[in-house]
Amino acid sequence: MLCLPVFIILLLLASPAASNPLKTRIQSDLIRAALEDADMKNEKNILSSIMGSLGTIGNVVGNVCCSITKSCCASEE
């Protein structure tokens, strides 16, 4: 008869619902903040790489145009 109550108590202690709510709340806040920081860093890196690529592509297109015809690089002469 004593086994069943002891088993239930042990089961309740081992269940995830018995965890400390403050600890899980702090952990979830820290995880959310870290994910937001990671998203902001990724956006900045993506935007800077796109802008850098556009400048590089513009230079390549200008060089190709100048090698084909001199009309597009008349401003440089």
UniProtKB/Swiss-Prot annotation:
Modification note: Contains 2 disulfide bonds that can be either 'C1-C3, C2-C4' or 'C1-C4, C2-C3', since these disulfide connectivities have been observed for conotoxins with cysteine framework V (for examples, see AC P0DQQ7 and AC P81755).
Entry superkingdom: Eukaryota
Keywords assigned: Disulfide bond, Neurotoxin, Secreted, Signal, Toxin
Main location: secreted
Propeptide residue interval(s): 20-44
Family annotation (InterPro entries): Conotoxin
Location(s), subcellular: Secreted
Listed GO MF terms: ion channel inhibitor activity; toxin activity
Pfam families xrefs: Conotoxin (PF02950)
Tissue specificity note: Expressed by the venom duct.
Signal peptide positions (record): 1-19
Entry domain remark: The cysteine framework is V (CC-CC).
Family: Belongs to the conotoxin T superfamily.
Protein name: Conotoxin Ar5.1 b
Annotated source species: Conus arenatus
Lineage: Eukaryota, Metazoa, Spiralia, Lophotrochozoa, Mollusca
